């Protein structure tokens, strides 16, 4: 039977509950346990798919096409286990499920209430489908004290009494701020956060305390006394230079041992930390450096590109180099010469996005990469714009654009109205809802034999995750191929372009899918490994 660790956060948001959950899962995995991680988000959106990147950050897409919280990306990267739609739920989805049942009459005339109906729905989500897991880690989004989180806290309180003894552990992540004028770390915010948690009937078993400097033993004892936890259960979580140091740091502080002790497990095998130590060594001892430019439109919030940042780092690990990222807001290139920003970088990456804003700037960046033979990777929107750039500047069709931007007879990129998902055709219309209506999840693509991309993958059949509503118009394939482009990846039915490359260039590839979503530190995605390898070669030309 699965054991449950409920992870809550207090004092402030963005403390890193997702990283803490992922790191703990990695430590339990290293001891040989089977671990599942789930994220419960208190917001009323059904999913984050229609939320602004500035509000939410990245939308992480799973193989089964679920649009989820970016923390699921951390879970996958740290554990190597692919998540699915059953690993993330929101208040919006819970309420929608309940209202649908009420309309069907499933509640037999009962008054539908937060307790028991909402809390029961939450508990069902937490406890269903865990037969193959030894531990289930549940991260509760938001901060203790938020009104939106109250039903979730009540649900996990109830589970403590409903599950067998020693089946539930509560871990609370807090912050100990350093007050420079006093020269002290302060415990009071943590005390008040724990008091807030205790007021809803939850007594934390473990305190994971974020701090920017070592916590004195006297302060740990103080937290132990006033928060009613064992001294050994006050774990310091010091700032580290990379998230891949976190599992090692938490193990040294005894987090995994304390978790097992709280469950009454005294004979657990020692964790095998070799691969984490190897990753940490390669990060801290690179054999060189390269610089790439990411030309985006959400660069004001780096969380909008979280998986991309990590995938680039994984490419660096594969090549034993540190990758420096120059973040460039695409709109700058609509006024400034791209050469001022791009002439010294070793690679250019144009990531996914939506909407016309910044598109012309990205097109100019792509043109610069193509003309100056700088390694280029275009992802999703980046591939679409690479096709538009080529049709304009190589084929001479000046009005080439996307139907997403404007009405034009030269729509190189258009709205997909239907596509094959497995054996079923899915259809969309321009007037349909935005939420959950894209081509989402893992799809097979066939790669052209002996193409650059097929050599990178080492195969001609791949399965990658997608998230897009628009697609390159297949009718422009012949035009682009006359000017040196190759449509090197297609959907199995030959209708949807999946990858392009430019023969007159050392490394120029665009893909319609999102390879960053499947990259892992222990298994870097081949496209990013190859892209960074190309930037290493480019750096030798400087």
From Swiss-Prot:
Gene Ontology molecular function terms on file: ATP binding; CTP synthase activity; glutaminase activity; identical protein binding; metal ion binding
Residues that, per the record, bind CTP: 13, 146-148, 186-191, 222
Residues annotated to bind ATP: 14-19, 71
EC number(s) recorded for this UniProt protein: 6.3.4.2
Note: CTPSs have evolved a hybrid strategy for distinguishing between UTP and CTP. The overlapping regions of the product feedback inhibitory and substrate sites recognize a common feature in both compounds, the triphosphate moiety. To differentiate isosteric substrate and product pyrimidine rings, an additional pocket far from the expected kinase/ligase catalytic site, specifically recognizes the cytosine and ribose portions of the product inhibitor.
Oligomer status and interactors: Homotetramer.
NCBIfam families per the UniProt record, alphabetical: PRK05380.1 (NF003792), PyrG (TIGR00337)
Protein name per its UniProtKB record: CTP synthase
């Amino acid at each position: 039977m699965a054991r449950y660790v409920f992870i809550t956060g207090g004092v402030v948001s963005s403390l890193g509950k997702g990283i803490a959950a992922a790191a703990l899962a990695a430590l339990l995995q290293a001891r040989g346990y089977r671990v599942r991680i789930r994220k419960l988000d208190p917001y009323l959106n059904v999913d984050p798919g229609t939320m602004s990147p500035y509000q939410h950050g990245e939308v992480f897409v799973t193989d089964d096409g679920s649009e989820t919280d970016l923390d699921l990306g951390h879970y996958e990267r740290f554990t190597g286990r692919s998540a699915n739609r059953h690993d993330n739920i929101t208040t919006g989805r819970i309420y929608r499920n309940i209202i649908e049942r009420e309309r069907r009459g499933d509640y037999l005339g009962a008054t539908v209430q937060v307790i028991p109906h909402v809390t029961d729905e939450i508990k069902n989500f937490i406890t269903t489908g865990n037969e193959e897991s030894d531990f289930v880690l549940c991260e509760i989004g938001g901060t203790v004290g938020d009104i939106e989180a109250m039903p979730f806290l009540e649900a996990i309180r109830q589970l403590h009494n409903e599950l067998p003894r020693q089946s539930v552990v509560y871990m609370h992540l807090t912050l100990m701020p350093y007050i420079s004028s006093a020269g002290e770390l302060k415990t009071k915010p943590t005390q008040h956060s724990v008091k807030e948690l205790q007021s809803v009937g939850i007594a934390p078993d473990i305190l994971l305390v974020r701090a920017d400097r070592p916590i004195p033993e006297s302060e740990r004892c103080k937290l132990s006394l006033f928060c009613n936890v064992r001294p050994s259960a006050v774990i310091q979580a010091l700032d580290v230079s990379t998230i891949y140091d976190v599992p090692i740091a938490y193990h040294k502080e005894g987090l995994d041992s304390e978790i097992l002790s709280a469950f009454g497990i005294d004979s657990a095998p020692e964790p095998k930390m070799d691969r984490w130590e190897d990753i940490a060594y390669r990060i801290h001892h690179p054999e060189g450096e390269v610089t790439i430019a990411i030309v985006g439109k959400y660069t004001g919030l780096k969380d909008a590109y979280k998986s991309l940042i990590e995938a680039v780092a994984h490419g660096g690990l594969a090549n034993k180099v540190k990758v420096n990222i120059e973040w460039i807001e695409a709109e700058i290139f609509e006024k400034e010469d791209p050469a001022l920003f791009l002439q010294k970088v070793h690679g250019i990456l144009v990531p996914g996005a939506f909407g016309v804003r910044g598109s012309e700037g990205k097109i100019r960046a792509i043109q610069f990469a193509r003309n100056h033979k700088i390694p280029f990777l275009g992802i999703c929107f980046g591939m679409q714009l690479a096709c538009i750039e080529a049709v304009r500047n190589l084929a001479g069709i000046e009005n080439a654009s996307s139907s997403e931007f404007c009405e034009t007879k030269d729509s190189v990129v258009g709205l997909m109205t239907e596509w094959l998902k497995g054996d079923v055709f899915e259809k969309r219309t321009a007037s349909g809802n935005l939420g959950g209506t894209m081509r989402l999840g893992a799809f097979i693509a066939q790669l052209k034999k002996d193409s650059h991309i097929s050599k990178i993958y080492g195969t001609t059949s791949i399965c990658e995750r997608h998230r897009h509503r628009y697609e390159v118009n297949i009718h422009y394939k012949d035009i682009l191929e006359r000017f040196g482009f190759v449509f090197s990846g297609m959907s199995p039915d030959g209708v949807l372009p999946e990858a392009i490359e430019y023969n007159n260039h050392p490394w120029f590839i665009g893909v319609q899918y999102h390879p960053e979503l499947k990259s892992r530190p222990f298994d870097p995605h081949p496209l990013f490994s190859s892209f960074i390898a190309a930037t290493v070669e480019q750096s030798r030309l400087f």
